[in-house]
Amino acid sequence: MLFDRRKLLLGGAAGLMLPGLARGALAQGGPLSPAQIGTFPEGVTADSVFVGLNMPLTGVFSGDGSDLKLGYELAIAQINAGGAVPAAWGLKGKGVLGRQIRYKVADTEGKPNVAVQAATQFVQRDKAILFQGSVSSAEAIALEELASRDKVLYMVGIAGSNDVTGKNCQRYGFRSQQNAYMAAKALAPVVAKALGKKLKAAFLVPDYTYGQTVYDSFAKFTKEQGWTQVLKETVPLGTADYSSALLNIANSGADVFVNICFGSDAVASTKQAEQFGILSSMKLVVPNLSSFQDKEVGPELMQGVYGSCDFWWTMSDRYPLAKTFVDTFFEKNKYKPRWGAHIGYMQTYLWALSVERAGGFNPVDVIKVMEASKSQPYESTVGRVYFRAEDHQMVRPIPILKGKAPSAMKGPEDFYEVIDVVDGESVMNPPDLFGCKLGSYT
């Protein structure tokens, strides 16, 4: 289902530039980029460009998807309006190179085939110069493949599987979230120090690319810390009744329950784990916290829980751009943004900056700018970041969180303490570890 969010088209001096000029390639030196590729230059008018937004607004991942959507919409509104907020990111004027961003939103339902159908419409009907979004890693992988086939840039939304920037990486896809390897390598030493090094762990693993790669990475790095796996229970995506798996976990003798489920599956499995007495007999670790797991499960169950995520709103105390994001998001939406919203917000700004650096919307030029960002990193809501040229994985800090006790919460949304922000460079996988081969620009 598509939701139209057309914006007023406001021209600017930059709107007079001819969209077919490969200015970025000329500025960077080297061979000229193709004058026509994908939806370029057809998708660039004198005063606007179109961006397609894909995310689940129904189904298992609807909470994360709805948050992601609001982050995209806030960034687009700010960029279109111009002024102090986009200027603080380094953007000039209103819009991107003087062009307003038009957009539509598609509900992917968390299903790869639905996501591809929606994105295909954005490309063929709307001449999208960019499409963004996902919550399921499976849909992210499918959208990456579409992007490289149609030669249209794609910014991955929420997707933690190593495969997204590993064996399924694509030249036209970029990921802003840390991958499973990075998150696990950052989290494992923290939980081992806090909980102990000689512990037994039981894993609950959703049976798709995200669950399996998070399991592989977290099992590897906790084993290096001295943990022993006593049980791995695999469950289908969208499971309603976890009793069989949880009964086995309750009887496993484990010290730690590692719950890899995401979205509403994480909420349901955690609540059911409490009914089986697991949370009173074991420590809970969540390698990748869902956007609203805190609120939906409640602080009584989430207190003392360790996990990682992309962003937590109290990081506004650390980074000026994060403070502006949190404040403006709260003003518009009346709740503190979760990390889904942050992904959408941050990556929209990074795309706009990359277009301005390239001097145009030609996707080949924009990709090359993003691939060169190590030498010219972006200042962002989580500090300095860049995309690695070899696999398009963002190198970025990783927050490690611990759930607060209800009595320690300073407000209704103060669910976590940020106990560490791990340097991204220190936890990166070797670029060839997961078999990434990016493919051709053209």
Features from the language model and the residues they span:
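Extracytosolic ligand-binding ectodomains
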Residues: 2-12, 24-442
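C-terminal segment of classical bacterial N-terminal signal peptides
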Residues: 18-24
